[in-house]
From Swiss-Prot:
InterPro entries noted in UniProt: ARM-like, ARM-type_fold, BP28_C_dom, HEAT, HEAT_type_2, HEAT_Utp10/HEAT1, U3snoRNP10_N, UTP10
Compartments it resides in: Nucleus, Nucleolus; Membrane
Pfam families documented for this protein: BP28CT, HEAT, HEAT_HEATR1, U3snoRNP10
Quaternary structure and partners: Component of the ribosomal small subunit (SSU) processome.
Membrane topology listed for this record: Multi-pass membrane protein
GO cellular component, one term: 90S preribosome
Stated family: Belongs to the HEATR1/UTP10 family.
UniProt-recorded name of the protein: U3 small nucleolar RNA-associated protein 10
Organism: Aspergillus clavatus (strain ATCC 1007 / CBS 513.65 / DSM 816 / NCTC 3887 / NRRL 1 / QM 1276 / 107)
Length: 1819
C-alpha cells in the first residue's frame, strides 16, 4: 500500500508545476536557444523581453504578417503571463497563437532576429515543453545546423514515441544524419503523419518556405518508396494488401496537397510521391485515372513542367492509352503542348501520354465542333517523338476513327478535310510513309470506307515504283479477270521495235512492255509468252539488239527487285541456251558489273550467272569478232559507234582473269566488284594464281568502260558505272579525268530543267549525280584544281547552282591532296573570283572555300602583301594636291572620292585578315612581318579617313597575339623581332574606342614585353594612362584577364628597367599610379581590391603601398568605397600586401612592420605636402603644380583617411598579437616604429596649430592611433602626454580616453585595475585644474570609468563622487561642468548604490539648487534640468530610503514649476516622478502629494495630472497592505481632487483649468479610485463610499447651489465608472443613491446649461447600474417604483429637435436597460403604462400641454423608446401589444410627419418580430 502511494506521489511530483519548487523553476528559466544556461538563469523577463522584442521588431520589418502578434504574445502584458496559472481553455487559445507564430517564423530561423523572437516563446511560454511537437517540426528542416542542436539540448527528456528517433541524438548532443530521419518516416507512422500534418497546416496558413517543403518532399518520397519496397512479399495477395494499406495512408495527403495549388513546391512534392506510387506499386487503372486528373487539376504556370512529367510517368503505367477526360481537357488547354512534351521527352518517356492525346483527339469525331484538336495531330507526328511502333499505333487510331466515323454520324467538312490532310501527310512524308504502308499492310482496315469517309485516295504502295503500283492497283481485279491477258493483247500486234531499248531515256512502248512483264514475272509460262512478243524480236537476237536491250534496261532500271531479277534470269538463260552462237556479248559487261554492286544479293546472284554464261560463250568461241550490238546498242546514232570496243580476245582475257575468278565473292559482298576493278586496272590481279592484265589491255578495258559511261543514255546504270570508275585514278597510262572529261563537260552544259527531268524519269537524286560527275576529276591530275574551277569560271548564268556547289565541294575535298604550288595558283584564282565579281554567284562559294581549306603560309604572305598595295592605290584616287588640307599632325586628311572603290578596298582587307585569323596564324610565325606592315598601313590609313577600323585592327592584333603567345613558349622568338612596332600597338590602345582592339593590343604588349622587353618599355607608359580611362572600367571576364596579364607581365619589366637606369621607382611610375587611381571610380566594385592588390604586389608593397594609399586619399577623400579598398589593401594579412621589411622569426612581425613602415612613409608624405617646397608630394599628389590642390586640403584628406585606416584595419589585432609574442626583438622594433609614428602625428599637430581643419584631422589620427593600443598601453601613453604643458593636448587625449571608454572597452582584470589606478589622476585634475574644459573632459572620463568599472571596487569611486559633488565641480558657475558633474553623479548612484551616501548631502543640496537655477525665468537650462532629474531618478531607484519628506516636497514643488515651464522637456521629470512613485515608501510619497496638492493645482493642469499619475503608480506598484495602511492620506488626496470642479467653478473667470482639463483629471482620479478599491475589501471601502456620498450631497451649505451641483456632477461621473467597472459586485450600492437620483431627476434638465452635465452623468450612471444587475435588485418593486416614473418622465424634456436628440441618445437607452433589468411581465406593464402616457397629448407629468405628449418631439422620443424596447425584448415586450394598439392607430394618423414615419417603422418592427401583419388588429 505504501509503495503504491509513494509511486503515485512521485508521478504527481514529476508533473507538478508547483511555484514553490524554485530549483525546477530556475532550471526551466535557464533554457534558451541563444544564451548559455548560466547566463540565461541570471536574466529577468524584462531583460529577455527587451532582447527578444528587438528581434521581433526586425521580423515585422521583414514581413508585416508578424505585426498581429505584437498585441498578443509580444505585448508588454506577455511578460507577466504564466502558463501554469492559465486554465486549460486559455492554454488552448494560447497554443493556437504560438503555433501560428512558429509556422510563420519557420522560414526565417536561420536569421538572428527570428531566433531571438522564438527564444521569447521558449523562455516565457515554454513552447518546447507545452508545444513540443510543433516546435520540433518547425526546426526539423534545419536538422544539420547548430540551431537544431541547441533545440535538442532543451527539449524534455520524455519525448513521445513520435520523435523517439531524436532521443539518442539528444543524449549525445549530435545532429541527426538524414538516413535515420528517412528510416523513421518509413517505419514510424506517427512521425510521418506528424510531418505531413505540419506541412499541410503551415501551407494552409501561407507560411510555407523552401527549406520546409524541400525537406518534406525528399523525406516523404524516400519514405513512400521505402514502405513500398519493404512490403514486397512472395505472396501476391499479401503484397497487394500491404500496398493498398500504404496507398490509403498516402492518398489523403496527396489530395490535400493538390488542393493547395498556390504552394508550388508542395504540389511538386506530391507529384514526386505520385510517381513513386505509380512506379513501385501496381495501381488500378481507376486509381491511376484519379491521380492523373488530380495532377492535371493542380498545376499552375510554376508547376506545369513537373506536372507534365508526372502525367507522362503515370500514363506509362496505364495498360490502356486512353487518358481520363479531365486530364485530357487540361492538356489540350495548354499552349503548344507538343513543344512542352518535346522538352521533357529527352529525359522521360512520353509515348503513352502522346498516344493518349492522339486517342482523345480522334475520339467522337462526329461530335467535334471545331478542328482545334485535330490540328494538333500533324505536329505530334512531325516531331517524331514517337517510336516506329508507337507511331504505327497512333496511325491505326486515326485510321480506325476515320473508318468508323460513318457509323456514329456525319463528320463536319472541316473535320473531314483535316483528317484527309493528315492521311496524305502519312503518304508523302519520308519518315512516316514506310510506317504507314506497314500499318496498312498489317491491319484489316476497310480502305474503301476510309477513302469514302475522307473523300481522298490512299496510295498503298510507294509512289516512285510504278510497277508495284500496277500490281497493287490491280490486285483486286486479278481475282475477277486475267489482267496479264488484256495487257498482252494490246502488245501482240506491235511490230519489232526499230532500235535498241537502251537508245533513249523515254520510249513509250517500253513503259507498256515493262508493265506487262511485271505482270508476267511471277509465272514462267507467262514469261515465255511475253518473251515471244514480236516487238522484242527474240528470233532476231543475233542481228538486232531489241530483245536483250529490253531486259538489260529492266534489270538496270529503278524497278522492283523481283522484276529486275526475272529480267536478269531471262538474260542468263538466253545466254546459256544460245552458247553455240558465235557472238561477243561484251556490250552487256558494264551493265552486269553495275548489277554486281547492287545492294540486293538476288540481283548479284543472277548477274553472276549471266557473267558465267558469257564466260562459257568465250570459252567456246575464242576467235570470233562478232560483237553483239556493236553499232546498235545505244541506237543507230554515233553514240553506239563512239564506244571503244575490246577485241574479243581481250574481252575473253578480262573475263577469265578479272571477272570470273571473283564472282563468288561478289555475290556476297556488293563492294567487292569495285575492289576487283580497282586492282585489275591498276595491274594487280585479284586471284594470285591468275596472271595480270598487261598495260595496253588495262588501258583498253578502262577506255571501254569509260566510253560506255559517256555514251550510255540512261542515268541509272550510268550512275552505277561512274560509282565504279570513280574509284580508279589511273589505268594503263591514262587518268579517269582525261577519259571522262567529255562526260563532265556534257553534264555541265545541261540546264537545270533538263537535269531535273532526267533525274525524275530515271529516279536518281540530283545531288548524287552531281557529286559523281565532279568526282571524275581526280587529285592526281596535275591541273585538277584548275580543271574544276574552269568548269565554273568564267561564270555563266546557265550554270546550275547544284553543279557549282558540287564543284566547290570537290575542290575542298581534294585540296589537301594537291601540291602547294597548285594550291597557290588555285588560291590566287579563287581570291580573284571572290573579290573580282561582287555580283557573281561564285563569290560566296569562293570565299567559303578559302575559309574552309588550310592555306599554306606562302599564300597568306602573298595575301597580306596586297593590303599595303591596296591602301597605296586607294590614296592615289584622293583629291588633287592643291585641294588637300593638312591636319595638325601634318598628315593628309584624305577624302575618298569613289565610295564604291573604298568599299571594295575595305572588303578586300577584311577578307584577307579574316583568312589569316582563321588559318591558325600561330603556326605561321613568318606572317609577323606582314602583319606589322599591315598594322602600320591600317594605322596610317585610319588617321587619314578618320575611321576607327576596329574590326580590321582587332583581326591584325589577334593574329599577331597568337604568334607572340606561341613564341613565348619557346626559349627563342620564332620570328625576327626587329620587325616589331611597339609604338603602333600602343597607339592602338591609345586611339581606339573598341574594347576588343584595346584588349588585344594590351595582351600583345604584354606578350612582347616578355620576348622583346627592350623594344617595348620605352612606349609602355601611355598604355597605363589609357587603361585608367577605359579598359579598367570593363567588367567582363575577358577584360579582367587582359588587365591581369598586362599587370603581371608589363609592370615587373618596367620596374626592373627603372632600377637598371637607377631612377626612383616611385617617381618613375607616378604616371602609372595616377592612371589606376584615376580609374578607381570606373572599375567595377567587386574587382577593385583584387586589381589594386595585384598592382601593388607587382610594383612592390614596401615601396609603393603608401603612395597608392596617398593618391587614393588625395583624389577621393572620404569616399566610402575608396576607404573600403584602402582598408582591404592594408588589412589582408594573408596577401603579399604585408611583405617583410626584413625577415623576423615571429609569424606576424614581418607583415606588421611593413604596415607600420607604410604608415610612417604616408605621414612623411603629409609632412612633405605642408612644406614650402614639397618634393615627393609634388610628384605623387601634384602639390605646387599649376593644376594641383591646396596643400592644406590635401593634408586634411590624407589625415582623415589615415584615421579611418587606423580605426578599421587589422592594425589593432596585429599589435596585440605582436605584444603577446615572446620575441623581444620584434616587440622592440614595433614599439620604436609606433613611437616614431606617434611623434610624427604630434609634430604635425604642433606645426598646424594655425590650420584648424588640418589640426582637427590630425587629432582624429591621434585618436585612431591610440585606438590601436590596448587599454593598458593607452593609459600608459596618456599619463605621459598629460605631463605636457599644452592644455589643448591634455583635453584632446582625455576626450580620446572618454571615447574609448564609451565604446566597448576591455574587461579583463589587468585593464580594470589599470583604469581604476588612473582614477586619482582624473580626480586631481577636477580638484585642482583651473581649465574648465579640461575639468569637463576629466569628469566625462570619471563618468565612463564609474559606469564601466565602478562595481569592481566601489570604494575607489566614492572619493571621486565626493569631489564631483563638491564646489570644485558642480559648484562651479560654468553650466557645462555642472551638467557633466550631475550626470556623472547619476551614473555613480547607479553603480555605487548605498555606497553613495557619503556624497549624498552635498549632492542633494547642490542638485536641488541647480534645478531651481535651471527653472529661473529667462535663464532656463533644459540640459541642466534633465541632468538633475536623471540624478533624482537614480537616487530613487538605489537609495530611496535616504530621501526625506522635505526633500520630496522640494522635488515636487520644483517638478510643478518644471511642468509649467515651456522650455523644459517632460521625459526626465516624468521618469523621476515615476521612480519616486515606484520606489519611495508609499506613505512618504502620498504624504508629499497631500501636502503639495494645492501647489500642483496652482501650477496648472500638467502638474496636477502628473501628480495624480504619481498616486496612481504608487497604488499600482505597492502591495495591498501599503494601500490599506495609507487609506487616510489617500482618501484625503482623492477628496481634494474630487473637489477640483467646484473650486474652479467658484473662481469663475480666474479659473486656471479649462473644463476639458477638469474632465480629464476627473477621468484620472476615477481610475485612481478604482485601483484603490481593487486593493481594499468591502468593509474598508463602504465607509469611504458613504463618506464620499455625504461629502457630495450634504457637504456644502444649501445656499451654495453651484458648489453642490459641481460636487454631484463629479460624484455621479465617478459612480458611472464605479458601476461600469465593478459591475454586479457593487449593484447593491445603488440603494445609497436612489433618493438622491430621484431628486436630481426632478430638477436637472438637458436644456439647462447649469444642470446639463449633471443630467448626463445621472443618465449614464443609471444605465451602468441597470446594465450589470445580476442580483434582481431592480426587479424589486420598491426600487423599480421609486426610479421608473422619474426616469420615464425625462421624455418630457424632448421639446425641440436638440433636446429630443439628447433624450433619445441618453434617456431612451437608460429606460431600455431598466426594462431589461426589471425582467417581469408585471414590471413591464407598469413601465409601458408610464411610457404610453407620452404617446398622447396632454399627458405630461405636470399635466400641462408642454410637459405631456402634446409636443410631437415628446411623442417621437416615446416612440423611439418603444422601438428600442421592442428591439431588445422582442416578444416579451410585445405581450403588451393589446394595450399598445389603440395608441398605434392614433399615432398612424398623427399630424406630425416624423411621428407618423416612426410609428410605421415601429409597426414593421413588430410585424418582423411576430411574423404576422398588424393590419387586421389595427382596423
Amino acid at each position: 500500500m505504501a509503495s503504491s502511494l509513494a509511486a503515485q506521489l512521485s508521478q504527481i511530483a514529476a508533473k507538478s508545476t508547483n511555484q514553490l519548487d524554485l530549483k525546477a523553476q530556475r532550471l526551466s528559466h535557464s533554457q534558451s536557444l541563444i544564451f548559455d544556461r548560466k547566463v540565461a538563469g541570471t536574466q529577468d523577463f524584462d531583460t529577455v523581453y527587451q532582447i527578444c522584442f528587438e528581434g521581433f521588431q526586425e521580423l515585422c520589418q521583414l514581413d508585416a504578417r508578424f505585426n498581429s502578434f505584437e498585441r498578443t504574445i509580444f505585448s508588454e502584458q506577455s511578460k507577466t503571463e504564466d502558463r501554469t496559472q492559465l486554465s486549460a481553455a486559455q492554454n488552448k487559445e494560447l497554443d493556437v497563437v504560438l503555433e501560428a507564430f512558429l509556422a510563420l517564423v519557420g522560414g526565417r530561423l536561420l536569421l538572428s532576429p527570428a531566433v531571438k523572437a522564438v527564444d521569447w516563446l521558449i523562455r516565457r511560454f515554454r513552447v518546447h515543453e507545452y508545444n513540443t511537437e510543433f516546435t520540433i517540426l518547425t526546426f526539423l528542416p534545419y536538422y544539420t545546423t547548430p540551431l537544431f542542436l541547441n533545440l535538442l539540448s532543451i527539449l524534455p527528456e520524455d519525448l513521445t514515441p513520435t520523435f523517439k528517433i531524436l532521443i539518442p541524438y539528444k543524449k549525445g548532443l549530435l545532429n541527426p544524419p538524414r538516413h535515420p530521419l528517412v528510416h523513421s518516416a518509413t517505419t514510424n507512422r506517427a512521425f510521418l503523419a506528424a510531418v505531413n500534418n505540419y506541412v499541410l497546416t503551415v501551407s494552409r496558413q501561407q507560411a510555407h518556405h523552401h527549406a520546409l517543403l524541400a525537406f518534406w518532399a525528399g523525406i516523404i518520397t524516400e519514405a513512400v518508396a521505402g514502405m513500398l519496397d519493404s512490403s514486397r512479399s512472395g505472396r501476391r495477395e499479401v503484397e497487394k494488401q500491404k500496398h493498398e494499406d500504404i496507398i490509403l495512408r498516402i492518398l489523403p495527403i496527396l489530395n490535400d496537397g493538390f488542393a493547395l495549388k498556390n504552394v508550388s513546391e508542395l504540389v511538386i512534392g506530391c507529384y514526386m510521391v505520385s510517381v513513386v506510387l505509380a512506379q513501385k506499386s501496381s495501381l488500378q487503372d481507376k486509381l491511376l485515372d484519379g491521380l492523373m486528373e488530380a495532377v492535371a487539376g493542380s498545376w499552375t504556370e510554376e508547376t506545369l513542367e513537373s506536372g507534365l512529367v508526372c502525367l507522362a510517368v503515370l500514363a506509362q503505367q496505364k495498360p490502356e492509352t486512353r487518358l481520363p477526360r479531365r486530364a485530357l481537357k487540361a492538356i489540350l488547354r495548354l499552349d503548344d503542348i507538343v513543344k512542352r512534351l518535346t522538352d521533357i521527352s529527352s529525359q522521360y518517356q512520353t509515348s503513352n501520354l502522346l498516344l493518349g492525346v492522339v486517342a482523345g483527339c480522334v475520339d467522337d469525331l462526329t461530335k467535334h465542333k471545331d478542328t482545334a484538336r485535330l490540328e494538333l495531330l500533324p505536329r505530334v507526328f512531325q516531331t517524331q517523338l514517337l517510336g516506329e511502333l508507337e507511331t504505327s499505333k497512333a496511325m491505326a487510331m486515326v485510321l480506325h476513327a476515320a473508318s468508323n466515323a460513318h457509323r456514329d454520324g456525319t463528320m463536319s467538312l472541316d473535320t473531314q478535310a483535316c483528317l484527309a490532310d493528315l492521311v496524305q501527310e502519312f503518304n508523302q512524308s519520308e519518315f512516316l510513309q514506310p510506317i504507314f504502308q506497314k500499318t496498312i499492310a498489317e491491319s484489316t482496315f476497310d480502305t474503301a470506307a476510309i477513302e469514302h469517309n475522307l473523300q481522298t485516295v490512299i496510295v498503298t504502295a510507294p509512289a516512285p515504283r510504278a510497277v508495284e503500283d500496277v500490281v497493287m492497283g490491280d490486285a483486286e481485279k486479278v481475282v475477277e479477270q486475267d489482267g496479264f491477258s488484256s495487257t498482252l493483247e494490246a502488245l501482240v500486234g506491235e511490230k519489232l521495235f526499230k532500235s535498241s531499248f537502251l537508245s533513249a531515256q523515254s520510249i513509250p512502248v517500253f513503259d507498256r512492255l515493262v508493265q506487262a512483264f511485271a505482270l508476267a514475272a511471277s509465272s514462267e509460262e507467262k514469261t515465255q509468252v511475253f518473251s515471244d512478243l514480236a516487238v522484242l524480236g527474240k528470233s532476231e537476237v543475233s542481228k538486232s539488239p531489241q530483245y536483250l536491250s529490253f531486259f538489260i534496261r529492266v534489270f538496270s532500271g529503278p524497278y522492283p527487285i523481283g522484276t529486275r531479277a526475272m529480267a536478269l534470269n531471262i538474260v542468263a538463260t538466253f545466254l546459256t541456251s544460245t552458247s553455240n552462237l558465235d557472238l561477243d556479248f561484251q556490250a552487256i559487261l558494264p551493265f552486269l558489273l553495275v548489277a554486281l554492286a547492287d545492294p540486293s544479293e538476288r540481283i548479284r546472284r543472277e548477274a553472276a550467272a549471266a557473267l558465267a554464261a558469257i564466260g562459257g560463250i568465250y570459252k567456246k568461241h575464242k576467235k570470233g569478232e562478232n560483237v553483239w550490238g556493236r553499232d546498235t546498242i545505244y541506237g543507230q546514232e554515233k553514240q553506239s559507234k563512239s564506244v571503244q570496243w575490246l577485241p574479243t580476245r581481250d574481252a575473253q582475257k578480262v573475263f577469265e582473269r578479272a571477272v570470273l575468278p571473283s564472282l563468288e565473292e561478289c555475290i556476297f559482298d556488293p563492294g567487292h566488284i569495285s575492289k576487283v576493278l580497282e586492282t585489275t586496272l591498276r595491274g594487280a590481279s585479284v586471284d594470285p594464281n591468275a596472271s595480270e592484265l598487261k598495260k595496253p589491255l588495262r588501258l583498253s578495258f578502262f577506255t571501254f568502260l569509260c566510253s560506255h559511261a559517256i555514251q550510255l543514255p540512261l542515268f541509272t546504270p550510268k550512275l552505277g558505272l561512274l560509282g565504279l570508275l570513280n574509284r580508279i585514278d589511273k589505268a594503263g597510262g591514262t587518268t579517269r579525268t582525261k577519259e571522262l572529261e567529255p562526260l563532265l563537260k556534257a553534264w555541265r552544259g545541261l540546264s537545270e530543267q533538263e537535269v531535273s527531268d532526267i533525274c525524275e524519269k530515271q529516279r536518281v537524286p540530283v545531288s548524287e549525280v552531281e557529286s559523281q560527275m565532279v568526282t571524275i576529276v581526280t587529285p592526281k591530275e596535275k591541273d585538277a584544281l584548275t580543271l574544276l574551277l574552269s568548269n565554273v569560271s568564267p561564270y555563266s548564268e546557265s550554270l546550275r547552282s547544284t553543279f557549282v556547289a558540287a564543284i566547290f565541294a570537290r575542290v575542298k575535298d581534294i585540296w589537301a591532296r594537291v601540291s602547294e604550288d597548285r594550291q597557290v595558283l588555285a588560291a590566287e584564282q579563287l581570291f580573284d573570283i571572290a573579290l573580282g565579281l561582287s555580283d557573281s554567284a561564285l563569290v560566296n562559294n569562293c570565299r567559303n572555300l578559302l575559309r574552309s581549306v588550310e592555306l599554306p603560309g606562302s599564300v597568306l604572305i602573298e595575301f597580306l602583301e596586297k593590303i599595303p598595295v591596296s591602301l597605296t592605290d586607294m590614296e592615289a584616287v584622293g583629291p588633287a594636291p592643291k585641294r588637300r588640307r593638312t591636319s595638325q599632325s601634318n598628315m593628309i586628311a584624305m577624302t575618298v572620292k569613289d565610295e564604291a572603290e573604298f568599299g571594295k578596298v575595305m572588303e578586300k582587307m577584311t577578307f584577307i585578315l579574316e583568312l589569316v585569323d582563321s588559318s591558325s596564324p600561330e603556326t605561321h610565325p613568318e606572317l609577323a612581318d606582314g602583319l606589322f606592315q599591315t598594322l602600320a598601313a591600317l594605322h596610317h590609313f585610319k588617321s587619314q579617313i578618320q575611321s576607327g577600323m576596329s574590326y580590321l585592327l582587332s583581326l591584325t592584333l589577334g593574329s599577331l597575339l597568337a604568334i607572340v603567345n606561341r613564341s613565348k613558349e619557346s626559349a627563342k622568338a620564332q620570328f625576327d623581332t626587329s620587325v616589331i612596332r611597339a609604338d603602333l600597338v600602343v597607339d592602338c590602345v591609345r586611339t581606339t574606342e573598341s574594347p576588343q582592339v584595346q584588349n588585344a593590343a594590351l595582351l600583345l604588349v604584354s606578350g612582347l614585353s616578355v620576348i622583346a622587353p627592350e623594344l617595348v618599355l620605352h612606349s609602355v607608359m601611355p598604355i597605363f594612362t589609357f587603361m585608367g580611362s577605359s579598359v579598367l572600367r570593363k567588367d567582363d571576364e575577358y577584360s579582367v584577364s587582359v588587365i591581369d596579364q598586362t599587370i603581371d607581365q608589363v609592370v615587373p619589366a618596367l620596374i626592373q628597367s627603372l632600377r637598371n637606369q637607377k631612377r626612383d621607382v616611385v617617381s618613375g611610375t607616378s604616371e602609372l599610379l595616377l592612371s589606376f587611381t584615376a580609374a578607381f571610380e570606373h572599375i567595377p566594385s567587386h574587382r577593385r581590391l583584387r586589381l589594386f592588390h595585384a598592382l601593388i604586389t607587382k610594383l612592390g608593397t614596401q615601396d609603393f603601398l603608401f603612395a597608392v594609399l596617398a593618391m587614393l586619399a588625395n583624389r577621393y577623400a572620404m569616399d566610402k568605397d575608396v576607404l573600403v579598398l584602402m582598408t582591404g589593401l592594408v588589412s589582408d594579412a594573408s596577401a603579399p600586401v604585408e611583405l617583410t621589411v626584413r625577415r623576423v622569426h615571429f609569424y606576424c612581425g614581418d607583415s606588421f612592420l611593413t604596415k607600420l613602415q607604410t604608415y610612417y612613409k604616408y605621414l612623411d608624405l603629409v609632412t612633405d605636402s605642408l612644406k614650402a617646397k614639397p618634393s615627393i608630394s609634388q610628384v605623387l599628389l601634384g602639390i605646387g603644380s599649376d593644376d594641383g590642390r591646396e596643400p592644406q586640403k590635401v593634408a586634411v584628406d590624407l589625415l582623415r583617411d589615415l584615421a579611418y585606416l587606423f580605426k578599421h584595419s587589422s592594425l589593432k589585432v596585429k599589435m596585440a598579437k605582436a605584444f603577446a609574442s615572446e620575441d623581444e626583438e620584434v616587440i622592440g622594433q614595433i614599439r620604436a616604429l609606433f613611437s616614431r609614428i606617434l611623434e610624427q602625428v604630434l609634430t604635425i599637430g604642433d606645426s598646424v596649430q594655425s590650420m584648424k581643419l588640418v589640426g582637427q584631422a590630425n587629432s582624429d589620427v591621434l585618436g585612431a592611433l591610440f585606438g590601436t593600443l590596448t587599454l593598458v598601453d593607452f593609459l600608459d601613453t596618456i599619463e605621459v602626454l598629460l605631463q605636457r604643458p599644452s592644455d589643448e593636448l591634455r583635453r584632446k587625449v582625455l576626450r580620446l580616453l572618454e571615447g574609448r571608454l564609451r565604446q566597448n572597452p576591455e574587461r579583463d582584470g589587468a585593464s580594470q585595475i589599470r583604469v581604476l589606478d588612473f582614477l586619482p589622476t582624473l580626480v586631481d585634475i577636477v580638484r585642482s585644474s583651473p581649465d574648465i574644459l579640461l575639468k569637463h573632459a576629466a569628469v566625462a572620463c570619471i563618468d565612463r570609468i564609474a559606469e564601466k568599472y565602478g562595481k569592481k571596487d566601489p570604494s575607489r569611486v566614492v572619493s571621486a563622487a565626493q569631489v564631483v559633488a563638491s564646489e570644485a565641480c558642480i559648484g562651479q558657475e560654468d553650466d557645462r561642468i555642472r551638467i557633466m558633474g550631475v550626470l556623472c553623479l547619476a551614473s555613480m548612484a547607479d553603480v555605487l548604490g548605498q555606497a553613495m551616501i557619503p556624497a549624498l548631502p552635498e549632492a542633494l543640496s547642490r542638485s536641488l539648487a541647480l534645478l531651481e537655477v535651471s527653472l529661473e525665468k529667462g535663464k532656463e537650462n533644459s540640459r541642466l534640468h534633465d541632468a538633475t532629474f536623471s540624478l533624482f531618478s537614480a537616487l530613487f531607484v538605489h537609495i530611496p530610503y535616504m530621501i526625506s519628506g522635505p526633500i520630496l516636497d522640494q522635488i515636487l514643488l520644483l517638478s510643478f514649476k518644471s511642468a509649467n515651464a515651456e522650455d523644459c522637456e517632460d521625459d526626465g521629470r516624468q521618469e523621476a516622478l515615476r521612480m519616486m512613485a515606484r520606489k519611495v515608501d508609499m506613505a512618504a510619497t502620498l504624504g508629499a502629494v497631500d501636502r503639495n496638492w494645492q501647489y500642483a493645482v496652482q501650477a496648472g493642469p500638467a502638474a496636477a495630472k502628473e501628480t495624480l499619475e504619481v498616486v496612481s503608480l504608487a497604488i499600482e506598484k505597492h502591495p495591498k497592505s501599503a494601500t490599506g495602511k495609507n487609506i487616510g492620506v489617500l482618501t484625503s488626496i482623492l477628496f481634494k481632487v474630487f473637489d477640483l470642479r467646484r473650486e474652479q467653478l467658484a473662481l469663475g473667470s480666474k479659473a486656471t483649468f479649462e473644463m476639458a482639463d477638469i474632465e480629464e483629471i476627473e477621468e484620472s482620479v476615477n481610475d485612481v479610485t478604482i485601483k484603490m478599491i481593487y486593493k481594499l475589501n468591502d468593509s474598508t471601502f463602504r465607509p469611504i463610499f458613504t463618506k464620499l456620498q455625504d461629502w457630495a450631497i450634504a457637504g456644502l451649505p444649501k445656499k451654495d447651489t453651484q458648489g453642490s451641483l459641481a460636487r454631484l456632477t463629479t460624484f455621479y461621473k465617478f459612480l458611472q465608472v464605479f458601476f461600469g467597472t465593478l459591475q454586479s459586485i457593487v449593484t447593491g450600492y445603488a440603494s445609497y443613491i436612489i433618493e438622491s437620483v430621484v431628486s436630481i431627476l426632478g430638477k436637472a434638465s438637458p436644456s439647462d446649461k447649469n444642470t446639463k452635465s449633471l443630467w448626463l452623468a445621472t443618465m449614464r450612471l443609471l444605465r451602468s447600474a441597470f446594465e450589470h444587475d445580476q442580483d434582481e435588485f431592480w426587479q424589486s418593486p420598491s426600487h423599480l417604483t421609486q426610479i421608473s416614473k422619474p426616469l420615464i418622465s425625462q421624455l418630457a424634456h424632448a421639446t425641440n429637435s436638440s433636446t429630443a436628440a439628447l433624450v433619445i441618445a441618453e434617456a431612451v437607452p437608460t429606460i431600455t436597460e431598466l426594462a431589461i433589468a426589471a425582467d417581469s411581465t408585471d414590471n413591464h406593464k407598469d413601465l409601458n403604462t408610464l411610457l404610453m402616457r407620452f404617446l398622447r397629448p396632454s399627458s405630461g407629468p405636470t399635466g400641462n400641454r408642454v410637459a405631456g405628449g402634446e409636443n410631437p418631439h415628446t411623442r417621437l422620443a416615446a416612440l423611439k423608446a418603444e422601438q428600442s424596447l421592442t428591439e431588445q425584448l422582442g416578444e416579451e415586450w410585445l405581450a403588451l401589444l393589446p394595450e399598445m394598439l389603440p395608441y398605434i392607430s392614433e399615432l398612424m394618423e398623427d399630424e406630425d410627419e416624423n411621428v407618423e414615419r416612426e410609428v410605421r417603422k415601429w409597426v414593421k418592427q413588430i410585424e418582423n418580430v411576430l411574423g404576422e401583419k398588424l393590419d387586421d388588429m389595427l382596423t
